């Protein structure tokens, strides 16, 4: 649990630093070219969740976030989390808490990473969002794996046996 907390804290600190830098150095809603046609910094405020879903419902989003945090906490405490899981949960919690901070103190999330791929304008997001997505993907892909990322066959067999013996 301690390692998960350290990873989360690192994500939160880097996320806060980047959001403060963007807020202090980039005009709101102005696209700033970093790599022409591909990567821009665009300081914008997202009052909703991903893709501005539930926009304007800050209290609802805070409430849902607190429920998700509680569920993750319970999951971490119930399961034996491997190295990949520690990293994944650290990213996930750091990202969730980074965006929760914004919602509580500003009423919106500060987004700034703006990518265009083949003239397709992808959603503007932030480091916390990226941490959430990467953490979730790692948990999905490596669920039930041992420390090296290999499927833990013994654990699977044991769980199947327990289920059959009910």
Model-assigned labels for residue ranges:
Residues 1-166:
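Alpha-helical transmembrane bundles and membrane-interface segments of multipass inner-membrane proteins
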